[in-house]
Amino acid sequence: MWKRNLLLLILLHIGAFLFPFLTVSKEKLTPERIAVALALLAVVLMSEALSIYLIFKRRGLRLREGLIWILELKEIEYAKLSEEERDLAVKFGYIIIGFPAAGLMLCGAVLEWGDLALAFKFPIIFFAFIVPLLQLCLFPLVVLFYTYNRFLKNDLAASANFSVFWAKLSIAGLVLVLLSLMLVKSEVLPFVKTITAHRTAFILAPLFNIFVGALQYLMAKTGSRELMVTFSIVLFASPLLSFALLLELLGAYSLQESLKFALIGVSVIFLAMFAATWVVLRLFGYSFDTLQRAVEEARVEGPILFWLFWVNAAIVGIGIFFVIRILTF
């Protein structure tokens, strides 16, 4: 099995590194640009190999031994790993995804613009644009996922870990946005005009998500019913600001107009979610009161949780789709 996974990993790298050469127009593929791009790819590959070697060495594993172990790891076995082994697997995943992505972007930027400085600035701009945008698009699903873990599954550890991850991602997004505003002035790079024109929304979006991550973490840790009620009200009101920032960030409306539009959109989505939840509960013979008692007594049936989560997730996803569709129409 590990040989098959290793082959897939090699093919992933080959595909990522060949993609820029196949997509950039032929007139831009000068010998000088190709030479610089190949040198960058060599540096990326050596850095990736060194990173993998070091994470295995810290765990007392040889490179071959570590690769075989991690490439034979199955999804079912992952849940049974110790915290140290899980940390190793996650870091390995970041490395084998991050380095090919970096190689693809750097190589593509060098071939496209022929400027090494711009090539290193492009990933900053790209992720400064994409991280806040994705966070705002996924935010209603994040609230739903957190609610599912915290209140229906009563899994406090998973809720706290997810909150920390969300806050860290938001901090990374904020740093990238600030770096892009300070360092990148060239309008040759894509997304520069969008970020500078809507800098307020790009700064507020990660700050907003840092606050939400901290709020969710406190909800996982607090034992006070009064605080939980207060936090829940704030959390479920937060998609309104999320939608408003998304609309302003995409440049369709001013922030004031976006708030009005978001109020309508969020209200419609929440009403649809409430109605869908009521229908699902009735189909399984529950009401809102009996579901609450069942959760408190830890006797909730698996199928109802499955349908509650995915029906509401579908409603949120469709709602987001229509928002973006309206903006780009």
UniProtKB/Swiss-Prot annotation:
UniProt topology in membrane: Multi-pass membrane protein
Localisation per UniProt entry: Cell membrane
Key words, A-Z: Cell membrane, Membrane, Transmembrane, Transmembrane helix
Transmembrane segments: 5-24, 34-56, 92-114, 124-146, 159-181, 196-218, 231-253, 263-285, 306-328
Protein name per its UniProtKB record: Uncharacterized protein AF_2131
Species whose genome carries this gene: Archaeoglobus fulgidus (strain ATCC 49558 / DSM 4304 / JCM 9628 / NBRC 100126 / VC-16)
Taxonomic superkingdom: Archaea
Primary localization: membrane
Gene Ontology cellular-component terms listed: plasma membrane
Phylogenetic classification of the source organism: Archaea, Methanobacteriati, Methanobacteriota, Archaeoglobi, Archaeoglobales
Recorded coiled-coil stretches: none
